[in-house]
Amino acid sequence: MPQLDTSTWFTTILSTSFSIIHRLQLKLTTHIFSPNPTPKDLKTLKHHNPWDKKWTKSYLPLSLHQH
């Protein structure tokens, strides 16, 4: 039964991890961060949906009263 050749695994793992770290650094350096973050008012974040003003009730078929 032939043995598994693991002589190149160290090089492969090392180069892969180096590549992942390098790409992560590139992503972080090109990302634009806000220079002066300020808290937002929570009231301005409310979305107005058309169904908010309506009262609706949905019934499941098994929850109906059976007489």
Swiss-Prot record:
Modified sites of kind N6-succinyllysine: K54
Membrane in keyword set: yes
Membrane topology term: Single-pass membrane protein
Bilayer-spanning residue ranges: 8-24
Subcellular location field: Mitochondrion membrane
Major subcellular site: mitochondrion
Listed GO biological process terms: proton motive force-driven ATP synthesis
Modified residues (N6-acetyllysine): K54, K57
Family, per entry: Belongs to the ATPase protein 8 family.
Entry protein name: ATP synthase F(0) complex subunit 8
Organism: Glis glis (Fat dormouse)
